[in-house]
Regions:
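Acidic, divalent-metal-coordinating active-site segment for phosphoryl/phosphodiester hydrolysis
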Residues: 185-191
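Helix-loop "lid/cap" segments that line or gate small-molecule binding pockets
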Residues: 180, 233, 252-257
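CoA-thioester-processing core
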Residues: 108-114, 122, 128-182, 195, ...
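C-terminal long alpha-helix characteristic of the crotonase
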Residues: 142-147, 198-247, 260-261, 278-283
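Conserved CoA-thioester-binding segment of acyl-CoA-metabolizing enzymes
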Residues: 7-10, 14-62, 283, 287
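Glycine- (often His-adjacent) and acidic-residue-rich active-site loop
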Residues: 61-108, 157, 241
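Single conserved hydrophobic/aromatic residue that forms the stacking wall/gate
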Residues: 1-9, 13, 285-302
Length: 302
């Protein structure tokens, strides 16, 4: 795998065993999320999603804390951009610009939801503010005993706005979400585990990463098409009825599933007592500098 982000070493990417490992690497800044992060992360996730060389994404960080959330430079940069792009004094236009900018920030974590690849997050120390938005978008979360989660925005006089509230009520009881949101208190690892926010808690960082990578390797062995279908079906059920969920998976199976391919490979591998080899689900038909829309148009004309 060869992904382009190397700028200022704010994030590193490693790849092994069909696992793309994204590492936040600003320990001296408590891995706060700078301006570049908000465009770099979706670009990287989308690239991994498109080339399909990786079957799982793991996100972790270096240092004592997972992340202190949005870097203060994002706030000042947004204000400067609004003043530069909207020199007019009309408050409606200024607020409209702010609204569009906020939607753009929200897209950063939407890419995790929209990716067909499972995203696992490993958390140590503080997961604060925007990092909670980040974590709530992931498919699975694991943490160390010293981890804590804090909806920090309320403590600085604002409302969390890039993903916490649309997602956290699907992960935690509503009353608990409101308590965390209204008080800004810290939820520590044992409480997060008891409530189901994290899948497991580990005594130290090394044990956590070892187990997370073991789980990622197990997922990577499965049919990428079946994993994709499972993620789509599970995410689709949010806010929908059982009937709607059943209809969605029925449509998926009749449209995507072929028992002569992945099921045949899985059963043969079990009989032969070996790991199955599933074909990747990639966008390899894309030509250089061609978008997905370009590809669709080209195929329609061929």
């Amino acid at each position: 795998l060869h992904y382009p982000l190397r700028r200022q070493r704010q994030m590193c990417i490693r790849d092994r065993d069909k696992i793309a490992h994204i590492i936040l690497n600003r320990p001296e800044k408590m891995n706060s999320l700078p301006v570049s992060f908000w465009s770099d992360l979706p670009r990287i996730i989308n690239e991994i999603d498109y080339d399909a060389l990786a079957r799982v994404i793991v996100i972790s960080s270096t240092g004592k804390h997972f992340s202190a959330g949005m870097d203060l430079s994002v706030f000042s940069n947004a204000e400067n951009a609004r003043n530069k792009e909207n020199p007019q004094t009309d408050p409606g236009r200024k607020k409209g610009s702010f609204y569009k900018g906020l939607l753009k920030l929200q897209e950063t974590f939407n890419c995790i939801d929209n990716s067909r690849i499972p995203v696992l997050m490993a958390i140590q120390g503080g997961c604060i503010g925007g990092a909670v938005d980040f974590a709530s978008a992931c498919d699975m979360r694991y943490c160390t005993e010293d981890a804590f989660f804090c909806i920090q925005e309320i403590n600085i006089g604002m409302t969390a706005d890039v993903g916490t509230f649309p997602r956290l009520p699907y992960l935690l009881p509503m009353g608990l979400v409101k308590e965390l949101a209204f008080t800004g208190r810290r939820m520590f690892a044992n409480e997060a585990n008891e409530c189901g926010l994290v899948n497991n808690v580990f005594s130290n960082y090394e044990d956590m990463m070892k187990e997370v990578m073991t789980i990622a390797k197990e997922i990577a062995k499965k049919s990428p098409l079946a994993v994709w279908g499972s993620k789509e079906a599970i995410n689709y059920t949010r806010g929908r009825t059982i009937e709607e969920g059943l209809n969605q998976i029925a449509m998926w199976q009749t449209g995507m599933y072929n028992p002569q391919v992945d099921m045949k490979e899985a059963l043969s591998a079990q009989i032969e007592k070996k790991d199955p080899e599933f074909e990747a689900v990639s966008y390899t038909h894309l030509r250089a500098h061609e978008t997905v829309l370009d590809l669709v148009c080209r195929l329609l004309l061929e």
